[in-house]
Amino acid sequence: MSQVNMRDMLKAGVHFGHQTRYWNPKMGKYIFGARNKIHIINLEKTLPMFNEALTFVERLASGKNKILFVGTKRSAGKIVAEEAARCGSPYVDHRWLGGMLTNFKTIRQSIKRLRELEVQAEDGTFAKLTKKEALMRTRDLEKLDRSLGGIKDMGGLPDALFVIDVDHERIAITEANKLGIPVIGVVDTNSSPEGVDYIIPGNDDAIRAIQLYMGSMADAVIRGRNNVAGGTDVFVEEAPAAAAVEG
């Protein structure tokens, strides 16, 4: 199991929080102190919590479960899409549509429409339409792809959410909480950790920090899937007990 170390976090600026006047008291126990009116996050607390979250994700992936990556703010979107694609995971990088989880039946219909338009764009249907109609369908396709392209292959509800900036993605977290879907979240000093099952106290704005979180999570998914492909059982400690029962 590959883990993140303190040096990685320091280089990425994970320890830099927000201005002290914007702090959320619920994050007090994760704050080391302040420097130039900026809160400094205690990485001795962040490090084990992040590695615990990575272990959880690796175990989920080894069971062929789906982790939905969510990061829709400008600094996160591109990295979220790239790393999710690298590990073959679903993602939301543009805007969280209300009901994406709690009203998945309706979302599924929109995904079906997206697929129909993709087929029409490829099979020459658009070319047979009037210019106006072709333009309207192209715009529909682009709009649906921007909103739902990252989850079109998800197939059903995810088994966990990984969220960059829990305040920005509060609607997604609330929906996951309602459905009992575990939430892993990067929580900065100005945010509330409520509703987050695996808290990662850290900078949620710096691009290098976001790259570290997302790259590490994608690697954990890939490791978990490789465990399945290679026949490795990450729950190997349970195997003897199971064998004894069968015997």
Curated annotation (Swiss-Prot):
Cellular component, GO annotation: cytosolic small ribosomal subunit
Instruction: Report keywords, A-Z.
Output: Ribonucleoprotein, Ribosomal protein
Q: InterPro entries, from UniProt?
A: Ribosomal_uS2, Ribosomal_uS2_bac/mit/plastid, Ribosomal_uS2_CS, Ribosomal_uS2_flav_dom_sf
What the entry lists under Gene3D superfamilies is as follows: Glucose-6-phosphate isomerase like protein, domain 1 (3.40.50.10490), Helix hairpin bin (1.10.287.610)
- Could you give a single Gene Ontology term from the biological process aspect? translation
Q: Does the keyword ATP-binding apply?
A: no
The record, for Pfam families, names:
Ribosomal_S2
- Which CDD domains does the entry mention? RPS2
What molecular functions are annotated in GO for this chain?
Answer: structural constituent of ribosome
Reading the lineage from the top rank, the first entry is: Bacteria
Q: Which family does it belong to?
A: Belongs to the universal ribosomal protein uS2 family.
* NCBIfam families per record: rpsB_bact
Task: Give the protein's recorded name.
Answer: Small ribosomal subunit protein uS2
**Highest lineage ranks of the organism?**
Bacteria, Pseudomonadati, Pseudomonadota, Gammaproteobacteria, Pseudomonadales
